Amino acid sequence: MMKIAVAITGASGSIYAKIVLQQLQAMKAQVEEVAIVWSDNAKTVWQHELGNSDFESLSFKSFDKNDFMAPFASGSSSYGALVICPCSMGTLGRIAGGISNDLITRAADVMLKERRKLVCVVRETPYNLIHLRNMAAVTEAGGIVCPATPSFYSRPQSLEDAARTVTDRALQLCGLDVKGYKWGES
């Protein structure tokens, strides 16, 4: 059983966050606890992109982005993974630079220093050189950069199916057993 934190930033791609949360809700056999932290703009972007505020009915505990008393803000907690989905390039840059100025970046720093899973689902295109260097720095520090790039060999039939190819991969990278399409497996 894993405790997992989900950070949602204001980057475009709220559909990814919504699907991650739906998937985690369905993984009760693998996931003991889920905590959510929202950046300043995350809920605004969610409402703009998805046209709703479904996030208000989530059964997970939400933490304020300035709540450094949240359990996953400390290495002594038993949280095993943090997935930042979507991860803005600003957030990635602060993580790469070791700047822990809010709960999202502090939790990322904890995951790196404790050698736990940090998965950053970046959603930006095109990348500039600063983005690439920040992705390299986070990777070198032990994080995993998982671009929000859907795969199409599973022949997704909807936008949600395409987005799920990204979220399946992100949750697999966190160490969860996801029952999604896998190349060469029936």
Regions found by a protein language model. Give the residues of each.
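A cross-family phosphate/adenosyl-ligand binding-site feature
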Residues: 2-119, 123-186
